[in-house]
Curated annotation (Swiss-Prot):
Pfam families in the cross-refs: Ribosomal_S19 (PF00203)
HAMAP family to which the protein is assigned, alphabetical: Ribosomal_uS19
Matching PROSITE patterns: RIBOSOMAL_S19
Biological processes per GO annotation: ribosomal small subunit assembly; translation
Keyword terms of this UniProt record: Ribonucleoprotein, Ribosomal protein, RNA-binding, rRNA-binding
Molecular function (Gene Ontology), one example: structural constituent of ribosome
Cellular component terms (Gene Ontology): cytoplasm; small ribosomal subunit
Protein's job: Protein S19 forms a complex with S13 that binds strongly to the 16S ribosomal RNA.
Protein family (similarity comment): Belongs to the universal ribosomal protein uS19 family.
Name this protein carries in UniProt: Small ribosomal subunit protein uS19
């Protein structure tokens, strides 16, 4: 179920403070965060936010089409290595 509109988007306070201070200083430094649950707001446009995926920080450049999504959607936590093309061991004759 989506979040109620009367509540507004959720953004962690520490991340919001970093984004606002970066906007005031007009700096484009990478903002490092562990807050995957925070929603992307228009104030974050043009910034590169390094989102933690459980192992490392993945840089995410925020564009206009990402507004309204959560930061964790753009930093995948699982690596898919692919299926084996032709597995002769598991096949019965």
């Amino acid at each position: 179920m989506p979040r109620s509109l009367k509540k507004g988007p959720f953004v962690d306070d520490h991340l919001l403070r970093k984004v606002i201070s970066a906007n005031e200083a007009s700096s484009k430094n990478v903002i490092k965060t562990w807050s995957r649950r925070s929603m992307i707001i228009p104030a974050m446009l043009g910034h590169t936010i390094a989102v933690h995926d459980g192992r490392k920080h993945v840089p995410v450049f925020v564009t206009e089409s990402m507004v309204g999504h959560k930061l964790g959607e753009f930093a995948l936590t699982r690596t898919f290595r692919g299926h084996v093309k032709d597995d002769k061991k598991g096949r019965r004759r």
